[in-house]
């Protein structure tokens, strides 16, 4: 199980992602965050969110895995975005350490 990579001010974890109706399984997505931005890279294509564009980060449970739903205000991205990972507790702890609110 992959632990989130940490440096002085970032958290990063590999996983899978759902973007609207599209689904990419592990290991084809990576979520990286610092104190100001959240970046979800899916199959090499980045989705970048500023703190202001993130409306809510919420932990959720799927059939098999757990994930982080990203509610956002960016009209260029699909409305439904979920990052699936194996260690949601470590991810949410890292995000909270950086000042992100996760419900």
Predicted regions and their residues:
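Anionic N-terminal interaction surfaces
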Residues: 1-32, 73, 89-93, 97, ...
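Short, surface-exposed beta-strand/loop "edge" segments at domain boundaries and coil↔beta transitions
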Residues: 2, 40, 47-48, 75-83
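Canonical pleckstrin homology
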Residues: 28, 60-85
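Structural motif
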Residues: 30, 37-39
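Phosphoinositide-dependent membrane-docking surfaces
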Residues: 38, 48-62
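Residue-level recognition of conserved beta-strand positions in structured domain cores
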Residues: 42, 51, 70-72
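A short, sequence-level motif marking secondary-structure junctions
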Residues: 52-56, 82-90
């Amino acid at each position: 199980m992959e632990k989130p990579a940490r440096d002085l001010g970032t958290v990063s974890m590999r996983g899978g992602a759902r973007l609207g109706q599209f689904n990419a399984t592990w290991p084809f997505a990576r979520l990286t965050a610092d104190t100001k931005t959240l970046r979800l890279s899916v199959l090499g294509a980045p989705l970048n969110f500023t703190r202001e564009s993130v409306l809510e980060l919420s932990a959720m449970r799927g059939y098999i895995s757990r994930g982080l739903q990203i509610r956002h205000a960016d009209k260029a991205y699909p409305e439904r975005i979920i990052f699936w990972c194996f260690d949601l507790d470590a991810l949410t702890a890292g995000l909270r350490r950086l000042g992100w609110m996760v419900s």
